[in-house]
Every structure is written in C-alpha cells, then in structure tokens.
C-alpha cells in the first residue's frame, strides 16, 4: 500500500503503527466483539482492560515514537488525540475469524489519514481516495467531533492515500476556501477536516473577488460551520458576508474591512476587532460570543451573547490602550480624556448615533447589570480623568440622553455624577430655546431628550413660567410626537396641570375659550386651544392657541396664518387688528420671531414699493407704505386732498390712459425676474400685485368705508388689466374679470368696496397659484 502523494510510502511509517494494528487484530481474533473506543496517552494497562469483558471499552497507550513521528509544534495536541474504532466484528458471527491483512491496512490508513490531516501548521495533509473502513471504523483527532469514515465515496480499485501540503500563501488559502464553500453551496456534506481552516492566512484577500456574488447579497449564501481559529485576516475585506456557526477564536481581525458583515451563532472569543469597525455599515453579531475580545467603542453589540468575565487582566495592545469590561468583552476606552476623545467616544449626536454610551446602552435589558457595571466604570474614568465642565459641555446632551435614564439612575454612583451635568444641560436649554423653536424632534429626541427635559421641569417648577416658551414646546412635542410613549405623555399632561394652576397662568384659562371651555385642556383634539404662552415682558399678557396652530407657527410654511390665536390681557381677549405681528413677536413672544422673519423675507411685495416710491424722493411715504404691510389694519389714511394730490402726482406718469406704461411694465418684470418668464407666469405675478394694491386702497389700510385713494384703485385695476392681456386663462371667467374691473371704478352700479375685491381676488390666487401669492402678499395680510 502506497501513499499517493509523491515519495512518501507505507514503509516509512514507523513499525509501531503496524504493531498497534496487529495487537488490535490479535486481541479480537478469539471472538471478542469489542468496542475499542480510544487509543490515547494513558498509563492504563492493556491486559487489565481486556479482563473487563467483551463489551467494555479498551484503552491503548499511544507509543512515544508515533508521537515523535508527527513532531507537532504543540505536543499537547497529540496527547489529546483519540482513535475510535467502533463495532469491530467478525464477518461470519462465529467469533473466530481474524481481521484480514487488508482490513488491518485500512485501519492503518484511517489512523494515518485522520492524524496527518489534522496536524498543525507544518503537517496539514489532505487524504483522499480511501475506501471505507471495515465495520464503520471512525477516527477523530485533536478532540474534534468524530466524523464517520463510513460514508461511501467512489471506491477506487486499490486503496490510495493522498497527502497534500498546507497552502503556502493567502492566495492558496483563498482557493482552498473557495473550493470548500462552493462544494457546500452545491449541497455536498463537508467533513470537519473540509471545514477546518485553522491557522489559515487570508491577509489582503478581498473575499468578494474569490466568492460568487450571491454570497455578498442580503439573504444570500452563507459560509456555515467553518473553523477559522488562529487565522490571519489582517487587511482583508469580508464585507457583506454571512458567517454562521463559525469559529474565529484567536484569529487576527485587526484592520479588516467588515462592512455589513454578519456573524451569527459564532465563536469570536479572544479576538481583536480594533480598527475593523467603522461607524457606517457596521458588522452585526447575532447570538455570537466575544469573550475577551477587544471591541471598538462604536460597535453594535445589541445581539451578542454576554457571559460573566474571567479573571484575566486588561489586554495590552501596540501603541497602548485602555479597556473596560462589558460582560466578558473588553470595550475600548481612550488613554486620556482629551477634547478629541470626549467628542469621539461620547458625542453620538455628532457621530451618526455612535458612541461608547450607545454601545453599552443598546444591549438588551437582560444585561441590565452588565450595562450598569460598565457605565459605572465609565463614570469612574471620568472622575479619574478630571473632566472639566468646559470639556463636558459639548457632550452634555449625549450624556444625559443615556445616563439620566433607568437603569443607570438606579446607581448611586452614576446619579451623583450625572445630576449636575443634567442641571447645566437644562439651564442651557432654557437659555437657548425659550426664544427660538426647538429642533424638529426625531425619534432620538422624543425618547431620549424630552423625558430629561420633563424631569428637569419637574425638579424646577419655577422654570415653567419663567421659560414658558420652552416649556410649551416641550409639552407640545411630548403630546404630538409619534415616538413618545404613553408614559411620556402622561407625565407631560400632569406637568401641564401644575403649570395651569400657577397664579401667573390660571387667570387666562377661565374665559370660556381655553381647552374644553371649562379651564381644562382637551388633549383629544389638536384643534382645542390647549396651549397658553406667557409674555416675556408683561405678566398680564398671554397667547392662547391650539396644537395645530402652535406647530405651524413654530415650523411655518408659506400658507401659515399668523393671526390664528387669542391675545389675552388680564384673561380677556383683545383685538390684534392694529397690532403688528412682528412687533408682537419681538416684544412678547420671541419664540415665533425668527420663523416669522424667515417667511417675511421671502415676500417680495416691497420691491414694487421701492420702484414707485424711492426712498430718496418719497422717504416718508415709502415708510408709511412699508409699515402698513406689517399689520392688518392701519390708522393712517390717505384720503385727504393733499394726500390724494400727492399720490396722483406719483402714479399718473405710470398710468398713461389708465394703463401701465411700457417702461414701468419692464421695471416690474425686471424687479421680479420675469423678463424671460412665460406670459402666464407674468400674469399671475401682476394679478397678485393687484390684490395687494386693492388692499392698500381699502378701508383696512389707507381708505375708509366711504372713500379710498383713487390713484391706488386705478393702479390696482391697471395691474389686473395687464394680467388679463397676458393670460385670460388665469381668471375665473371674463364675467368675473369685468365685475372686478367695474368695482374698481364704480361703473355700471357696481359695489365699490375694494376690501371685497381684494378678498375675492386673494381667495382665487390662493386656490390656483398659491406659491406666487405667498411670494408677494405681506404676511400680515395673508
């Protein structure tokens, strides 16, 4: 019998192997149907074992020369070697037939095949072509699960053993893995040896180039059941692969690209994953153990298996390192809490939601104790690092978003440290967001920040009234946030009841207007006027408005109504007709001022005023026209003879024969960037300008119920006439156009109230070209 891989032949195998098999044959020839279950390094006497009977296991001492023949680097590996020989029986049930020479040779081959195939590093042979052993003999090595040699591959006429050397390069290892994975993909059962890639070298291998594309697809093919222990993966790319039931113990995984890599039901103990996990497209660890593994601080560990840690010391890494325990994992920490370290390790609000805080917190609740222990170690690190308030300030929000929540608040150590941090965070929020809108609350803000603010207002109830702008926003978002829990809403409602009972607030809610009209809020509808903001200047002044109105005024659109609220003084409703919204917001309710101004600058009506009434020639009149756009009603009237004469002098040159002069028309097109626009677009803009001048001429602004400035009526009608010439299609009908024209001039007995004309034209524009109207009409008139 020859080993088919070159110069090695059977005669080179030490005689001890032959003698061992001969001994087995001799001790079974007398009818013993024995189960020889193992041959291992033991001091048990062979003869003593045989005296126990035919059904008992028999243990043999493995000769030292056989161990020396293999010369593994780890002698303990061979000492643990097992040879299992099952159910060796005679073929005729007489119990007297000896094992044949051929069967003995097969047993010898099995012995050599299993042991040669499983040698470490320098002795990694692959044996192929062996015929099945007699009676289902199976051999196992290195304490690995026994794989039956009884499955029947194609039997060659003569027994041959093929020993192949270990792959000598990463490319060779990659080729071997590709072969095994493709066989597995094809449905071929792989032996333990087939899946054994321990001590492999995959450095610099990009796995997407050696495996079919389906392995990189979501829910694609899986690399299952492989042993990669002690293997090198440095600088390799295993992105988008799924490893299931694989073993990576003691492997080198530093500087590995593993974007979206999935490790499930795997053993990744004693591994370093430093510099391998980035904030984007992280790997996942599902039901995977990471005992004593070094993990970067931004890893996603939400599905790992944690166990109690052993007593091993913190690891040492090149370049230095600091670690804390998270269960039995080693979690990376900075050596020093520098400014960069504070931002990188703690500021998940600026780092795509990743920080050491979130890494710990995202573990499931069954690991509450492990999470609290890790956070306590983190806080101890803060204290020993002597973090100053100035250094903590940029990450206060991130810190309270985690540490001010259960279960960490149940730790006296953590609570004592986070309390002053939360107080400083709350003070900053009051200072910043009482006069400006809070950021649009996403899921994180609703679940992590709003509860902290509620808790802070609960601890400092005076801030509810001194900073009612912020307080009302917090309650608003708690009651409307889709990701807020019922518990958050209940606490918000309870706090608002305390607010309404405050002496500065309660006088404003018993006027038959608030909430459900009896002084209590009605949280069942967003239309109820449940919110009451106190003036920042006058304790007797308040604004009452609904949920929907408050939301839209904090985050306005071009169509937002800026007068859909009650203005209360001493609890009584007062008219806002002659109050400028911008002045009201600037003086009393600054939380709306920035949003109002942002919308106001997008309204371009003032550009036409500057064309007609230049500040150099008509400075006072220009100011009157601009000021009138900031309120719904004006006390200034321009119907006296002097005012009428002055307006006629200004507008007559612009309206020869009652129509826009060509030069003035071109000035309008240029001012509104309409020179190259379509006739319809030009017509829509002129129509909206006409509605604004109709408003100027009405009793609301410069006219009265019985009179109005003729120049303004004529100019409004001329703008409308030009719009009709350009695009009659934008009008409701020719009849409606004629009706509006007659009303401007009082022709054919038409009612001449320009307030009615302005309102009618404005409704039409809002319905058919609202964006044009919103870009022109002053906010106070909208």
Swiss-Prot record:
SUPFAM superfamilies according to UniProt: Pentapeptide repeat-like
Reaction equation(s) it catalyzes: S-ubiquitinyl-[E2 ubiquitin-conjugating enzyme]-L-cysteine + [acceptor protein]-L-lysine = [E2 ubiquitin-conjugating enzyme]-L-cysteine + N(6)-ubiquitinyl-[acceptor protein]-L-lysine
Pfam families xrefs: SopA, SopA_C
The record's account of how the chain is modified after translation: Ubiquitinated in the presence of host E1 ubiquitin-activating enzyme, E2 ubiquitin-conjugating enzyme and ubiquitin.
Enzyme class: transferase
Gene Ontology process terms (BP): protein ubiquitination
EC number in record: 2.3.2.26
Entry similarity comment: Belongs to the SopA E3 ligase family.
Function: Effector proteins function to alter host cell physiology and promote bacterial survival in host tissues. This protein is an E3 ubiquitin ligase that interferes with host's ubiquitination pathway.
Full protein name: E3 ubiquitin-protein ligase SopA
Species this chain originates from: Salmonella schwarzengrund (strain CVM19633)
Recorded name of the encoding gene: sopA
């Amino acid at each position: 019998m020859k080993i088919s891989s070159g110069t090695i032949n059977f005669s080179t195998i030490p005689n001890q192997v032959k003698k061992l098999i001969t001994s087995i044959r001799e001790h079974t020839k007398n009818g013993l149907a024995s189960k020889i279950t193992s041959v291992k390094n033991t001091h048990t006497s062979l003869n003593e074992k045989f005296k126990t009977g035919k059904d008992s296991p028999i243990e043999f001492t493995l000769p030292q020369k056989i161990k020396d023949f293999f010369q593994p680097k780890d002698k303990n590996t061979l000492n643990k070697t097992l040879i299992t020989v099952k159910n060796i029986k005679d073929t005729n049930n007489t119990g007297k037939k000896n094992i044949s020479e051929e069967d003995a040779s097969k047993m010898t081959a099995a012995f050599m095949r299993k042991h040669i195939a499983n040698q470490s590093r320098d002795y990694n042979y692959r044996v192929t072509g062996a015929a099945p052993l007699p009676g289902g003999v199976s051999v196992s090595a290195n304490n690995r699960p026994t794989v039956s040699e009884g499955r029947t591959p194609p039997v060659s006429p003569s027994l041959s053993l093929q020993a192949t050397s270990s792959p000598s390069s990463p490319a060779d290892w990659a080729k071997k893995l590709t072969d095994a994975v493709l066989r597995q993909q094809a449905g071929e059962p792989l032996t333990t040896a087939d899946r054994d890639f321990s001590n492999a070298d995959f450095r610099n291998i990009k796995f997407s180039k050696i495996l079919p594309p389906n392995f990189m697809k979501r829910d694609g093919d899986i690399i299952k059941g492989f042993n990669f222990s002690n293997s090198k993966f440095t600088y390799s790319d295993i992105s988008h692969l799924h490893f299931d039931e694989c073993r990576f113990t003691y492997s080198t995984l530093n500087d590995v690209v593993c974007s979206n890599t999935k490790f499930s039901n795997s053993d990744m103990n004693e591994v370093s994953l430093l510099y391998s996990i980035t904030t984007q497209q992280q790997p996942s660890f599902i039901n995977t153990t990471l005992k004593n593994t070094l993990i970067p601080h931004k890893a996603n560990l939400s599905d790992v298996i944690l166990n109690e840690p052993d007593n091993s010391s913190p690891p040492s890494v090149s370049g230095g390192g600091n670690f804390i325990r998270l269960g039995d994992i080693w979690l990376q920490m900075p050596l020093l809490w520098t400014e960069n370290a504070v931002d990188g390790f703690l500021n998940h609000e600026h780092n795509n939601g990743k920080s050491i805080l979130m890494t710990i917190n995202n573990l499931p609740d069954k690991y509450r104790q492990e999470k609290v222990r890790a956070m306590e170690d983190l806080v101890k690190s803060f204290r020993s690092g002597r973090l100053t308030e100035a250094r903590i300030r940029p990450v206060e929000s991130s810190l309270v978003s985690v540490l001010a929540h259960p279960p960490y608040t149940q730790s006296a150590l953590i609570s004592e440290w986070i309390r002053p941090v939360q107080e400083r965070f709350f003070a900053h929020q009051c200072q910043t967001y009482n006069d400006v809108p809070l950021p649009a609350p996403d899921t994180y803000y609703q679940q992590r920040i709003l509860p902290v603010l509620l808790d802070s207002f609960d601890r400092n109830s005076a801030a509810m009234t001194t900073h009612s702008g912020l307080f009302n926003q917090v309650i608003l978002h708690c009651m409307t946030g889709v990701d807020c829990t019922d518990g958050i809403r209940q606490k918000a409602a309870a706090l608002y009841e305390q607010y309404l009972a405050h002496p500065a607030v309660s006088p404003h809610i018993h006027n038959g207007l608030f909430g459900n009209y009896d002084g209590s809020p009605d949280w069942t509808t967003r239309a109820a006027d449940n919110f009451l903001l106190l003036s920042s200047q006058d304790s007797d002044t308040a604004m009452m408005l609904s949920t929907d109105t408050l939301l839209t005024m904090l985050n306005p659109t071009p169509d937002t109504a800026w007068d859909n609220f009650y203005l209360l003084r001493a609890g009584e409703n007062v008219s806002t007709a002659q109050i400028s919204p911008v002045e009201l917001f600037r003086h009393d309710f600054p939380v709306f001022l920035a949003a109002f101004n942002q919308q106001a600058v997008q309204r371009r009506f003032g550009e036409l005023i500057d064309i007609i009434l230049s500040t150099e020639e008509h400075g006072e009149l220009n100011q009157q026209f601009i000021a009138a756009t900031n309120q719904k009603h004006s006390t200034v009237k321009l119907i006296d003879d002097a005012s009428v004469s002055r307006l006629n002098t200004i507008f007559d040159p612009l309206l020869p024969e009652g129509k826009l002069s060509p030069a003035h028309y071109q000035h309008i097109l240029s001012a509104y960037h309409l020179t190259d626009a379509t006739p319809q677009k030009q017509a829509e803009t002129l129509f909206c300008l006409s509605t604004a001048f109709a408003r100027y001429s009405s009793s609301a602004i410069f006219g009265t119920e019985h009179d109005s400035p003729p120049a303004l009526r004529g100019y409004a009608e001329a703008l409308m006439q030009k719009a009709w010439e350009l695009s009659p299609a934008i009008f409701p009908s020719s009849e409606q156009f004629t009706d509006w024209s007659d009303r401007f001039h009082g022709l054919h007995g038409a009612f001449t109230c320009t307030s009615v004309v302005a309102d009618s034209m404005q409704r039409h524009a809002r319905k058919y070209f609202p964006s044009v109207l919103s870009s022109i009409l002053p906010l106070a008139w909208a």
